């Protein structure tokens, strides 16, 4: 209970809220594809990534695996950009609305991946978000995966393995 309501920087935990929005709106469409937009490449350059390159085609599911196994910023931003038709501010607004619907009271979301220092949350809010995510079979499956093999893509001649950064696995 001590400090459980204290607002702290959300950092990479922001991706869980992006994941919640994706699963809420698109859980039955995870095999749909999108092309990684060039527009987000500068924003995520030299940050946590899964080497998902602009112009390559991915399924939503592949992006979710990249987000959860490698904390991949380009996956979160690419999905947000694509699913919002380039309206990242609108996506963030939807994140904040869903967050409040889940019951969070101390969280503020300002981007889809956590690079912006304005993303804040509390321990209680993260518990609520994770409890919400547990409703989705895709989250349970993806979050428990120690590895994911990304298929060959337009700029990757061979498949490659993403090793989870989750030390609990």
List each language-model region with its residue ranges:
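Domain-terminus/edge residues, biased toward the C-terminal soluble/receptor-binding domains
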Residues: 100, 104-105, 114-169
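Active-site-adjacent loops and short helices of periplasmic peptidoglycan-processing enzymes
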Residues: 1-124, 133-137
């Amino acid at each position: 209970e001590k400090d459980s309501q204290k607002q702290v920087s959300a950092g990479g935990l922001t991706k869980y809220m992006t994941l919640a929005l994706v699963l809420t709106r698109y859980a039955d469409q995870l095999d749909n594809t999108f092309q990684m937009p060039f527009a987000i490449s500068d924003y995520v350059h030299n940050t946590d990534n899964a080497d998902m390159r602009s112009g390559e085609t991915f399924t939503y599911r592949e992006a979710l695996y990249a987000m959860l196994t490698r904390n991949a910023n380009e996956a979160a931003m690419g999905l947000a950009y694509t699913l919002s038709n380039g309206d990242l501010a609108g996506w963030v607004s939807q994140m904040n609305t869903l967050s409040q619907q889940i019951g969070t009271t101390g969280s503020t979301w300002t981007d889809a991946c956590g690079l912006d220092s304005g993303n804040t949350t509390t321990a209680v809010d993260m518990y609520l978000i994770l409890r919400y995510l547990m409703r989705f079979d895709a989250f349970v499956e993806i979050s428990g995966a120690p590895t994911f093999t990304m298929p060959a893509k337009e700029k990757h001649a061979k498949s490659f393995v993403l090793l989870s950064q989750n030390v609990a696995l």
